[in-house]
Amino acid sequence: MMVKLICAIVDIAGAAFPIDIDTNELVGDFKKVIKAENSRTIACDANDLRLFLAKTDGRWLTEFEVQNGVADISVFEELDVVGAPLNMIGLSEETVSSVAITKELVKAKKTPLHVLVVPSEPVQLQRKLWLVTGTVVNALGSKGIRRHLHLMASLHIGFYDPTRRVDNKNVAFWYEAKNLCFHVLFKSSTCFFYVSPF
């Protein structure tokens, strides 16, 4: 029996997506489909994905709740048996279609979400990440600016953005002519401002 499962990648805003799959398929097959549908967003191999049933206290999470952040995935059941058919682990056609979708639910973004996806790489699971992006004009001629930006990266307080991969590589810094561009994710608790002495 084919079902449409709504999935969301944890901690990537706007990363909810539908997957059409037969409920007789296995968890391992489901991981491959998720990876194939999100090859630019998910950097790790399909077998390194962790999947969780997006249900708590008998109720599906909503897209609105997931967009506001999932604080603790440990309260959700992990779908960690690769050989388990989806219809035996809470993703049967009956359980998935148990909520009638109405205009009100759609407008409030309270439609049910079925599966939480946690990639193992390249971003460690965090509650909230801030994106810091920008350009340093004429960085090749500015003394010390490259050193400060690369030092910030080497302190391991920033993370690569899995949505920004070039030629299958993580990219946080790159040059466009003489301008140094940066695109880094930070834990909100470690963000800081730097005022250049130059």
Swiss-Prot record:
GO CC annotation, single: host cell
Domain of life (superkingdom): Eukaryota
InterPro entries: Crinkler_N (IPR045379)
Subcellular location(s) of the protein: Secreted; Host cell
Keyword Methyltransferase (UniProt): no
Keywords: Secreted, Signal, Virulence
Locus of motif HVLVXXP motif: 114-119
Region (LQLFLAK domain): 16-55
Signal peptide: 1-15
Domain description: The CRN proteins have modular architectures that include a signal peptide, a conserved N-terminus, and highly diverse C-terminal domains. The conserved CRN N-terminus harbors a distinct LXLFLAK motif, which is followed by the conserved DWL domain. A highly conserved HVLVXXP motif marks the end of the CRN N-terminal domains and forms a junction where diverse C-terminal effector domains are fused. The conserved CRN N-terminus mediates the translocation into the plant host cells.
Task of the protein: Secreted effector that elicits necrosis in host plants, a characteristic of plant innate immunity.
Family: Belongs to the Crinkler effector family.
Name of the protein in its database record: Crinkler effector protein BLC01
Organism: Bremia lactucae
